[in-house]
């Protein structure tokens, strides 16, 4: 739900605006003057950028649910072809099917499909850029709803970005947002009866620079650890979950960070 997204107000408003427009798009484009001014490019596209774990996929899921539509994640392996012109044909076929089904398309890691065109150095580059032009035409002809995600906006070809009505960056959560995430997940996921009793440890954990996804999986790991120990989730379990998440990135808590959390328990 929208409540699951912990984002800056401006970003959250942008997502809600996109979802609202998605809900009224049929009514909107029935207006003759709008159809006359926009003979093409009526599709509703959203580019979500941000570091891994900042909630791009979750935002797409929330939007699709709000619209009451299925969310179809497109495997780029089914789109991208080494043969010139085939990628655009594959995309056109997928877009036509999605428009007929009235679904929301999700292009995860869209850089591979909508990346910057290269400087022309040989015939291969010229053909590759021609394929990109065909992709642009396919995008302009699509009248449905689609969401693209990328870790970095600069990876996407500016020509694609100019055709997108909505471009939003999901930042890493600040300390206040992390505190809210820790408290909310401790209550809803870990079933902590008295979140305030864990207030100090949760505040200490909120000082750690983690993404929303890392916090969510750290709490899940704490739930499993507590079940294994046969008791309720404690600050020690949460700290164990943080350790596991950081290990994925080849990181670990510094002694100072560990002392701060331990002192708060």
Residue ranges and their predicted role:
Residues 8, 141, 208-211:
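Membrane-interface junctions
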Residues 207-237, 243-251:
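AAA+ ATPase "lid" subdomain C-terminal helix
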Residues 1-6:
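Interdomain "pre-motor" coupling segment immediately N-terminal to P-loop NTPase/helicase cores
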Residues 252-256, 260:
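C-terminal regions of RecA-like/P-loop NTPase motor modules
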Residues 264-265:
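Accessory N-terminal regulatory regions that flank AAA+/P-loop NTPase motors
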Residues 10-199, 203:
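Walker A/P-loop NTP-binding motif of AAA+ ATPase domains
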């Amino acid at each position: 739900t929208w409540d699951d997204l912990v984002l800056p107000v401006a970003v959250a408003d942008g997502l809600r605006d996109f979802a609202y427009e998605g809900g009224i798009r049929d009514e909107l484009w029935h207006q003759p003057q709008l159809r006359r001014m926009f003979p093409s490019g009526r599709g509703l596209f959203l580019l979500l950028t941000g570091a891994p774990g900042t909630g791009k996929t979750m935002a797409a899921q929330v939007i699709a649910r709000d619209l009451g539509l299925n969310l179809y994640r497109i495997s780029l392996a089914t789109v991208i072809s080494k043969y010139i012109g085939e990628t655009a044909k594959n995309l056109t076929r997928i877009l036509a099917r999605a428009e007929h089904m009235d679904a929301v398309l999700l292009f995860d890691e869209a850089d591979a499909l909508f990346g910057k065109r290269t400087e022309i150095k040989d015939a291969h580059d010229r053909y590759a850029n021609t394929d990109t032009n065909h992709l642009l035409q396919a995008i302009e002809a699509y009248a449905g709803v689609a969401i693209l995600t990328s870790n970095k906006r600069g990876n996407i070809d500016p020509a694609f970005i100019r055709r997108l009505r909505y471009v939003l960056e999901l930042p890493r959560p600040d300390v206040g947002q992390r505190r809210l995430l820790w408290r909310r997940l401790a209550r809803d996921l870990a079933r902590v009866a008295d979140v305030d009793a864990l207030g100090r440890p949760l505040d200490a954990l909120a000082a750690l620079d983690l993404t929303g996804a890392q916090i969510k999986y750290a709490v899940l790991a704490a739930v499993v650890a507590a079940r294994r120990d046969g008791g309720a989730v404690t600050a020690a379990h949460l700290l164990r979950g943080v350790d596991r998440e950081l290990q994925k990135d080849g990181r670990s808590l510094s002694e100072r960070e560990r002392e701060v959390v331990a002192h708060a328990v």
